[in-house]
């Protein structure tokens, strides 16, 4: 009896950012999650923070700077040039992001950027938290069942 193991296939599988059930369970136990999305809205990375994003200590702006770090047009639209990014405590890849983002500019671009930002804040638990953290379950179920 011989077992054929194709190391290349296994490596490609692991590098393709497959979301395992343990990752899903971990996300559903996290309190403060920020989702990075493709241009079509599909979540690509879940960034986990141990502290809540707040306006009074400006951590919400620092998280936004991290979230849009690779999109200078959005950083400029949201006036985040002088803000230091706040790195997450952990990030979990959900899917591969190989799409180009459209260049955002003007009032419409600002509205799209803000919409994307405010839809990024999620929570995996049902404790009382600020209104801008939406339930995560819907997004994760969509990814796992695809």
Curated annotation (Swiss-Prot):
Coarse class of the protein's main subcellular location: virion
Domain of life from the UniProt record: Viruses
Origin species: Vaccinia virus (strain Copenhagen) (VACV)
Compartment(s) of residence: Virion
Family: Belongs to the orthopoxvirus OPG114 family.
Transmembrane segments: none
Name of the protein in its database record: Core protein D2
GO cellular component: virion component
Keywords: Late protein, Virion
Function: Late protein which is part of a large complex required for early virion morphogenesis. This complex participates in the formation of virosomes and the incorporation of virosomal contents into nascent immature virions.
Induction pattern: Expressed in the late phase of the viral replicative cycle.
Ubl conjugation in keyword set: no
Pfam families with a match to the protein in the record: Pox_D2
Subunit-level organization: Part of a complex composed of the kinase OPG054, OPG092, OPG100, OPG114, OPG115, OPG142 and OPG157.
Annotated InterPro entries: Pox_D2
Gene behind the chain: OPG114
